[in-house]
Curated annotation (Swiss-Prot):
It comes from the Eukaryota. The gene is Spn. GO terms for cellular component: basement membrane; cell surface; cleavage furrow; external side of plasma membrane; extracellular space; microvillus; plasma membrane; PML body. It comes from Rattus norvegicus (Rat). This is Leukosialin. A motif (Nuclear localization signal) lies at residues 259-273. The chain crosses the membrane at residues 232-254.
Length: 378
């Protein structure tokens, strides 16, 4: 509510108008510019209207200049106003007289304010209403006292203006959550502000308490590795190593077996020299003339010479070194004996030293056979 005082026609009439505290109002500079005529015109109080609550004594008229900006935020009320009841603020109106009206332009602020504090001075029979207190976050400033000097033929007026006081100091309490063995959590910070009262003389104490809490996130848990996992890893590595060793052993055995097979082949090819290979010559062929002479000269079968039929069968050789080959050689030498003469007998006898000749010697003529058989016995 706002109070409008008009002294133009009805001196004792008060008009109450609704007023919103949070609504925006013109600033002090705008008020001074709009009501420049009001600040220069002195206000004259009627002695009949200045009534004291302690008596019906009249006070002399006094003129107070309104040119001071510090006093533009206060207004005077009649002495009949109670000291405990807050005095409503004044606002602008078209019905207010330009000669005897006082207008209060409150400071707009978004911060919630307390009810105004009224201080009553019984000596001067006047009440001074200050603006409401506002709470801020910061360091508090000491109150400022503005005292106006006594005017000529006027009472002493004392005005106390309290500056805006800040809120109570904030106490921070920080608690940290210690990490456990397996759970790694983050620290939680809880900030709590303690409330302290700040008041002005004659006003209502102000209490403010704010509690801010920061939420802690969910703890992060890390799962440690199980002791059995390392053992399983070691076992798997051992198994893999064993399999590799077995494969290597099998490969070596197969290689040795292959070497053995190739060794038998190399032994069979050991007679190979300078690109030529020794091979079996096959059956030996005897000329037809030699075969016929051998069969004719050997009259008995004991000589071991093969008998030839009418078809002319040829003897065959099965091996390089055999008794049959030596027999054939001896037969060939015997064929050469009658044609060569006695000079070759001594040379041929040591060459043909076999038991077959000893058997054949009795069939030969005279003492020559005996002489030839004698050195063989020796």
């Amino acid at each position: 509510w706002a109070q409008v005082v008009s002294q133009e026609n009805l001196p004792n009439t008060m008009t109450m108008l609704p007023f919103t505290p949070n609504s925006e109002s013109p600033s002090t500079s705008e008020a001074l510019s709009t009501y420049s005529s009001i600040a220069t015109v002195p206000v004259t109080e009627d002695p009949k209207e200045s009534i004291s609550p302690w008596g019906q004594t009249t006070a002399p008229a006094s003129s107070i200049p309104l040119g001071t900006p510090e006093l533009s935020s206060f207004f005077f009320t009649s002495a009949g106003a109670s000291g405990n009841t807050p005095v409503p603020e004044l606002t602008t109106s078209q019905e207010v007289s330009t000669e005897a009206s006082l207008v209060l332009f409150p400071k707009s602020s978004g911060v919630a304010s307390d009810p105004p504090v009224t201080i009553t001075n019984p000596a001067t029979s006047s009440a001074v209403a200050s603006t409401s207190l506002e709470t801020f976050k910061g360091t508090s400033a000491p109150p400022v006292t503005v005292t106006s000097s006594t005017m000529t033929s006027g009472p002493f007026v004392a005005t106390t203006v309290s500056s805006e006081t800040s809120g109570p100091p904030v106490t921070m309490a920080t608690g940290s959550l210690g990490p456990s063995k397996e759970t790694h959590g983050l620290s939680a910070t809880i900030a709590t502000s303690s409330g302290e009262s700040s008041s002005v003389a004659g006003g209502t104490p102000v209490f403010s308490t704010k509690i801010s809490t920061t939420s802690t996130p969910n703890p992060i848990t890390t799962v440690p590795p199980r002791p059995g996992s390392s053992g399983m890893l070691l076992v798997s590595m051992l198994i893999a190593l064993t399999v590799v060793l077995v494969l290597v052993a099998l490969l070596l055995l197969w290689r040795q077996r292959q070497k053995r097979r190739t060794g038998a082949l190399t032994l069979s090819r050991g007679g190979k020299r300078n690109g030529t290979v020794d091979a079996w010559a096959g059956p030996a062929r005897v000329p037809d003339e030699e075969a016929t002479t051998a069969s004719g000269s050997g009259g008995n079968k004991s000589s071991g010479a093969p008998e030839t039929d009418g078809s002319g069968q040829r003897p065959t050789l099965t091996t390089f070194f055999s008794r049959r080959k030596s027999r054939q050689g001896s037969v060939a030498l015997e064929e050469l004996k009658p044609g060569t003469g006695p000079n070759l007998k001594g040379e041929e006898e040591p060459l043909v030293g076999s038991e077959d000749e000893a058997v054949e010697t009795p069939t030969s003529d005279g003492p020559q056979a005996k002489d030839g058989a004698a050195p063989q016995s020796l």
